[in-house]
């Protein structure tokens, strides 16, 4: 009887702790904005303020054309000369030429529903795409084609992708951008099997110029200096073998603790 009483107390404490975590999680979820459970969950994961955007996934730059892509829409802006003006640009949406409304300051807006979150600010040698984010996507017209402006005003002839999968790209903003940082870190672990890159080196290895990802999370002025995951940090710093060993110790600890709490 004495042994069963101790086991029951241990089980009750563990169960109460687990229940408190679950109830607290649902309470926080219910406090979020939204009329339905799915809306509340989405606002918890991604943030309501990010909904009214173009949801940019990739940017293609060629000699004459800047192409912006999301899951359903492609906006292309083409120029045949180095001097830019709204009247000299050609705009197409999903392959169909469209005519923008042009304001006095050179801002182009569009009547198409797919482009309701798109504005193009035309300047002498550049286009600024205001897509509903905290900062615009900046592109510059040069003699040999277009370049995008990246971190630290770096001029990019191509905008690098962290991952080619659109499904994964659409998940980048979730968990306050952590999904992007995790995918970014995993993409650079190919040479970290035995030895890692060393501590405090993450900032030098991550893709810092994935502009669509940065726009969808915070802005194009944000640098990432850590994976925001203890496990990925270990793999990147000291190697994947080191991570596997630590995970083995953690699993052993959890199994032994579970047996101690509920088992014989």
PLM feature spans:
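TM-adjacent membrane-interface loops and short helices in multi-pass inner/ER membrane proteins
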Residues: 145-224, 238-244
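Hydrophobic core of alpha-helical transmembrane segments in multi-pass integral membrane proteins
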Residues: 18-25, 250
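Membrane-interfacial segments
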Residues: 5, 33-34, 257-262
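Hydrophobic transmembrane alpha-helices and their immediate junctions
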Residues: 240-264
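Flexible juxtamembrane loops connecting transmembrane helices in multi-pass membrane enzymes
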Residues: 26-187
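Membrane-interfacial entry segments at the cytosolic side of transmembrane helices
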Residues: 3-18
